[in-house]
Amino acid sequence: MTPKTPKTPKPPQTPRPMLTVGSPPCTPCSPFVLNATSFCFRKGPARSVVYQPNGHPKQVVIDGEIWPPIFKPKNVRTAKSMQFGETDVVIATYPKCGTTWLQHITSQLIKGHDYKAGKGNELCVQSPMIERMGAAFADNIKGPRVLKTHFHHYNIPKYPDTKYIYCVRNPKDCLTSYFHHNRNFKIYNWANGTWDVFLDLFASGQLAFGDYFEHLLSWLPCLKDDNVLFLKYEDMFQDLENAVYKIGQFLGGEAAHRVENPEILREIVDNSTIDAMKKDQKRWFPESQLHKVEFIRKGGSRDWKNYFTREQSDRIDSIFAAKFAGTPAEHWWKYEMAWEEKPLSIENLSMEEEEEEQSQKLFALPPLPPQRRFSRTSLLSAGYGSVWSLSSQNANMSASSSVNKDLSTFAE
């Protein structure tokens, strides 16, 4: 009888890292634990890991990336390799950076009066998030399609004839809106979640769809691409008509013809204001998914001042400065992120106009003809909105310093 081969003893697990006061919160899928134990990959390539540490939103890890808990590996993976066509428009954002707003505007521009959203035919069904629903679902949608994604740029399928619209928003208002989003959506099981915990998770990139800062960094090199339109969320609120006109000109075809018609342009702008979008909010998501029916929560900017402490504000400022020094985004939100709100004055208006002129050089598109412009009535920003990849922590994806060096040419 052949003697049994003795079992090889299991190697001792790497001890949980010791974190000091002020360190990012350590979840089972934080980079600290991931690097030490490979927790997120123990279930094998076909399995996802759902987890919810005490006090945190419920989330899932798929291939080392953090997603909402209802996401499936097959859908995320097929979305990364799906095919886009020349009539497709892809709305790409970090969560709470104008996603629903842009879907609504773009659908009107492309489909005209054929676009209707309502209960049973919500916008999230007509214009699905590709990583949530998967390629097979999106393939069954009749073109022209308006598709939504929160993918980092390195995850998204890239086709030269497809139009991509990427909208950015200052991180403090994004964080504030995302906090309410996580409390409102039932899937996160976080209706009573706390602000301090959420801010820690946002600052350390441990939320569904990942790190805000890395997300923006991944898309910045596309700032000059012919088939990518960059929009600033705050600029859209300050001059919505001009934003709609730019989107129409970028899309071309029927969309361009619609914005060149003053009556149609006016109609689309009126349909896309905060007050208009707050009406009949069942158009956006099935109400059964929400604790509160109001998906469009609040307009205006600097709502973050109602939540942040000065220390928390300085913390986000420091992260932003470290990530974006030397890039075109370095001064994008100088006033929106400032702790002290700049008083309204002729001097400040002049300074803002100078910065807007510099911004126009980067966000280059034909400006709206003067006869169609509305008067500026506010300096405030507002918006709507609804990945950090744990695997992106390797040197090829998360080396912000090298990315910043590559991007510095765009600022010249």
UniProtKB/Swiss-Prot annotation:
Bias (Pro residues): 1-15
Compartments where found: Cytoplasm, Cytosol; Membrane
Tissue specificity field: Expressed in ASJ amphid sensory neurons.
The EC number(s) this enzyme carries: 2.8.2.1
Binding site for 3'-phosphoadenylyl sulfate: 96-101, 169, 177, 233, 272-277, 297-299
Comp. bias (Polar residues): 403-412
Thermal dependence, as annotated: Optimum temperature is 25 degrees Celsius with 4-hydroxyphenylacetamide as substrate.
Annotated Pfam families: Sulfotransfer_1
Major enzyme class: transferase
PANTHER family: SULFOTRANSFERASE SULT
Function: Sulfotransferase that utilizes 3'-phospho-5'-adenylyl sulfate (PAPS) as sulfonate donor to catalyze the sulfonation of xenobiotics that contain phenol functional groups. Acts in ASJ sensory neurons to modulate developmental arrest, perhaps by modifying endocrine signaling via the orphan nuclear receptor nhr-1.
Protein known as: Sulfotransferase ssu-1
Organism expressing this protein natively: Caenorhabditis elegans
Gene (name only): ssu-1
